Every structure is written in C-alpha cells, then in structure tokens.
C-alpha cells in the first residue's frame, strides 16, 4: 500500500494524524502526578483499555468507512482510496458439481506446493500434495533468473504429474492448473499478470515486469508437460473459491492469519474502473480488496501502535493489518508489557527479553489469554521461557492476561467491523438481498482457526453490529487451504466453460 498522502502537499498521513483526525478520539490525557509503582503499572493498563475501546458506535463508523473506501477503490484505478480493490478476473466460482482432476501450484515462500485434486461432482474424492524446497541460488544472487526459477518449478510439476495415476482425470489430455502466486502482480486477465516486485527472500530481477503465467507456461512446454494455467489467483480469492465449492451462499472470504486480506463477489456493473468491454457475461466479479491497507481516523490507535508503525519497514502503510493480524498482536502486547516493566520493574521481574522486538508471538498471547489454571501457571511459564521473566506474582500474571485480552478484543472487533463493511457494500445488511437469503463469509488463517477467544469475540461483534434479525442470515465459517484447494477449484470452474 502506498503511504497515505494529502494530494495538495503529499504530506504523509501517519497513525498519529489519523488518531488526531477522528471526531471520536479521546482528548490527550492531562499529566498525572507521581504515583506508587504498582499504581503506575495499573494506570498503563487502564489507559490502554480506554484507548483500545471499540464501542458499537465506533465500530459502525469503521464499517461505514470501510464500505466507503471500497466504493472509492472501485471507481478509478490508482485513485484516492487506500484499498486497491483489485479486479481478479475470476467471474465464475465453483458450484460443487465440477468433475475431473485439476492441479494447483502454490508459490509464496521458500517452499512451493503442487497438488492434484480429483473432483467427483459433489465433493473432493482425492487430494494429493507435495511440498518442494526452492534452492536459495534460484531465489536470489547472480544465478537467479526467471528461466531457472520457473524451469525448476516446471520440472517439479512434471515429476509430480509423472508419478500420479490419472484416476478420473482428463484422459491424457491437457491438464488444468490453478496458480496461486503470493507476490504483487498487475493482473490483466484470469490467466495473466506481470510481476510488480518480489517480497520475502526472492530477488530474481529479470522476472520483474514479466508475465509470470507466460514464464511458467513456457517452462512447462519446454519440458513436454501438457498443462495449461487456467487461473492466476491469490490465497484470499482461493479461500472464496474453496468456501463457494461447499456452500453456494458464500459471498466473501477473509484471511486472518499472519497477515490479513479479504475478497468478495461484486456486481460487475458497480466496478466503474472496469471498461464496458471487460464486463463478464456472468455480471459478477471477485474483487481482491487488499483491506490490510485500510485506514480511517476512527480506528482506535494507541501510542504503542504509532511506535510500532514508525519502526516498521513500511511506516504509514497497512494500518488495519497492523491492528488485527497475527503478525503484530504479540508485538503490541510486548510493547505494553515493556512500558509496565519500566513503570514497575519488580512486577515483571525485570525486563528480561522484553526489549527484543517480535520476541513475543501471537500464539504466545493466545496461550496466556486462554490460561484457566488457578495460579495462571501457563502465563508464568510463557513469561519465563519466552521473555526470561521469572518468579512473577499472581497479580502480575493477571495483568498480563488483561493486556492480552484488551489487544485481542480490539483486533477481533475491528475485524468484525470490516466484515460488516463488506456486507454493507454489497447490500446484505439492510433490505434487498440481505432479507431474502443467507450471506456466508468464509474465513481462513491460524488467528481465526486456533485463537478461540479471538474467534468468539469477532463472531459476537458481527452479531452485535448487524442486530439479531440480520445476524440470523449471516454465517461466518472456517474454510481451509484456499491457496491449494482453492486454486484447483478456480481452475475447474473456469475450465468447465472452455
């Protein structure tokens, strides 16, 4: 996401300026007189709870702002919206009736996955997968070229296909492949997209500006592999496809894991930036929102969020993601505990490893948040093993759990506001379609799947914002492996029309 800017003078919009611009933001606290150390620590927690507050009125404003940003992002390419609202060119989702064998390639890190999925017209009859490590020399360095990288991937695909029996497949004909490519691309059709830049450990310079589908297709052809890339997608679109395969009422998909994103089904005529010649016969189009970049003055930001943002690799960007995703929740908690330790050193037994950025991970936060032992022994164990803080008192452990609860609750309720914002945008909240049929949101990611209190809080907040009557028609459900199964299903959905 490009850093937010004011068009007149290109002034960067920081988290601080967002908070100051919000009508519902609390005024700066007056300087407090000196207080005993324990009271000072308790004051840190009280101020955190106040700053992270997400009453229904504020969440409603966030949902409305989300819907407004979505509208702006659909209006014009490269406009004022922080949300990119990328047209995926997926205009047909799986129905559950697809048959045959389809393949998927999931490339997004130092390993890639290849899968074969056999569909039996009503379910997945068989799924076979393999994970392949990529040699470091193919990802960066002097020998890292597009031809070598995609050649290696194509060779692994050919080997995988050669070892598989064609049970109910394509009778030796051309095979269909869904390609999940988790790097920024400029997509121009369902099966083409030019690489904008690499992220993570990749630095294959000659691939930038290249059509990654064409590069893979050429490598497969050179190796005699009769396979066609039917769809180029990201994991969020794949999650939508996977959810749609099992439930025809799925209208949106959300990733809540290390990162976060959302995709949804839009009325194609509502996409003003789409040329009339590009309107699909189905009149629907899946939109990749890139909602992690969403920013609004009424997002409840704290001093800890602002410091994290300024010290990040992308200050002023990905505001929403830094508040709700698994990558950052542990780090926010760490920063709060570090301040508590500075105010009351005896409470947490000294700082230990608290000064080390990102040493506390969200799974650690979840484990402490869910601790129901009488003496909060799990909290004590985590503090000792992860942070080197020994001999904590029950009072200190309760304070740590409270901090975890505040940070996770804010994240869950803001995620709920985003979901409601999408439902508002497509008319599934007030009247119309929302009154007549179910609206299902498929969610993937470890934060939602494994952090029970986060999940329950988010679901409760969705019901709170919608109201009981509307909430009866909205379902939030888990949908796994969008990057693998979802890619194969999109390939199946698009090959059926070929």
Swiss-Prot record:
GO terms for molecular function: ATP binding; D-glucose binding; fructokinase activity; glucokinase activity. Keywords: ATP-binding, Glycolysis, Kinase, Nucleotide-binding, Transferase. Highly expressed in senescent leaves. It catalyses: a D-hexose + ATP = a D-hexose 6-phosphate + ADP + H(+); D-fructose + ATP = D-fructose 6-phosphate + ADP + H(+); D-glucose + ATP = D-glucose 6-phosphate + ADP + H(+). One of its GO terms (biological process) is glycolytic process. Pfam families: Hexokinase_1, Hexokinase_2. The keyword Glycoprotein does not apply. Residues 234-481 are annotated as: Hexokinase large subdomain. Its EC number is 2.7.1.1. Pathway: Carbohydrate metabolism; hexose metabolism; Carbohydrate degradation; glycolysis; D-glyceraldehyde 3-phosphate and glycerone phosphate from D-glucose: step 1/4. GO terms for cellular component: cytosol; mitochondrion. Residues 39-492 form the Hexokinase domain. It comes from the Eukaryota. It is an enzyme of class 2 (transferase). D-glucose binds at residues 199-200, 234-235, 261, 290, 321. ADP binds at residues 109-111, 258, 446. Residues 95-233 are annotated as: Hexokinase small subdomain. Plants over-expressing HXK1 exhibit early leaf senescence phenotype. Fructose and glucose phosphorylating enzyme. Acts as a positive regulator of leaf senescence by mediating glucose accumulation and inducing an increase in reactive oxygen species (ROS). Belongs to the hexokinase family. This is Hexokinase-1. It comes from Oryza sativa subsp. japonica (Rice). The lineage of its organism: Eukaryota, Viridiplantae, Streptophyta, Embryophyta, Tracheophyta. The gene is HXK1.
């Amino acid at each position: 996401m490009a850093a937010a800017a004011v068009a007149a003078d290109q002034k960067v919009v920081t988290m601080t300026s967002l908070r100051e611009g919000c009508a519902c933001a609390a005024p700066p606290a007056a300087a407090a007189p000196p207080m005993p150390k324990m009271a000072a620590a308790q004051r840190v927690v009280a101020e955190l709870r106040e700053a992270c507050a997400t009453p229904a009125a504020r969440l409603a404003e966030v949902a409305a702002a989300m819907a407004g940003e979505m509208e702006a992002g659909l209006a014009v390419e490269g406009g004022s919206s922080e949300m990119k609202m990328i047209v995926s060119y997926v205009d047909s989702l799986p129905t559950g009736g697809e048959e045959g064998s389809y393949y998927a390639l999931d490339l997004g890190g130092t390993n890639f996955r290849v899968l074969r999925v056999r569909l039996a017209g009503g379910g997945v009859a068989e799924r076979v997968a393999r994970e392949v490590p990529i040699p470091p020399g193919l990802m960066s360095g002097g020998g890292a070229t597009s031809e070598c990288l995609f050649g290696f991937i194509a060779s692994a695909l050919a080997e995988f296909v050669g070892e598989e029996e064609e049970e109910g497949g394509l009778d030796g004909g051309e095979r269909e492949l869904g390609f999940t490519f988790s790097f920024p691309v400029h997509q121009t059709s369902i099966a083409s997209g030019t690489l904008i830049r690499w992220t993570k450990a990749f630095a294959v310079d000659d691939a930038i500006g290249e059509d990654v589908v064409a590069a893979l297709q050429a490598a497969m052809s050179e190796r005699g592999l009769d396979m066609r890339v039917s769809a180029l997608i990201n994991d969020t679109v794949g999650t939508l496809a996977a959810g749609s395969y099992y439930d025809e009422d799925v209208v949106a998909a959300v990733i809540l894991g290390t990162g976060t994103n959302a995709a949804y089904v839009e009325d194609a005529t509502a996409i003003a930036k789409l040329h009339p010649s590009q309107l699909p016969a189905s009149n629907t189009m899946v939109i990749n929102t890139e909602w992690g970049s969403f920013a609004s003055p009424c997002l409840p930001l704290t001093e800890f969020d602002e410091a994290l943002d300024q010290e990040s690799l992308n200050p002023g960007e990905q505001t929403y993601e830094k508040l709700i995703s698994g990558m950052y929740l542990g780090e926010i908690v760490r920063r709060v505990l570090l301040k508590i330790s500075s105010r009351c050193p005896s409470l947490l037994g000294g700082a230990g490893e608290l000064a080390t950025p990102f040493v506390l991970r969200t799974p650690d936060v979840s484990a402490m948040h869910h601790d129901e032992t009488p003496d909060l022994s799990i909290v004590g164990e985590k503090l000792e093993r992860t942070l080197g803080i020994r001999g904590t008192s029950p009072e200190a452990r309760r304070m740590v759990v409270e901090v975890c609860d505040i940070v996770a609750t804010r994240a869950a309720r803001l995620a709920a506001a985003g979901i409601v914002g999408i439902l508002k945008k497509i008319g599934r909240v007030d009247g119309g379609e929302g009154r007549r049929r179910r609206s299902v949101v498929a969610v993937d990611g470890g934060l939602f799947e494994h952090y029970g209190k986060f999940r329950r809080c988010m679901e409760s907040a969705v019901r709170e914002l919608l109201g009981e009557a509307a909430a009866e028609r909205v379902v939030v459900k888990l949908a796994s492996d969008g990057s693998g199964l979802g890619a194969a299903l999109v390939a199946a959905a698009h090959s059926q029309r070929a």
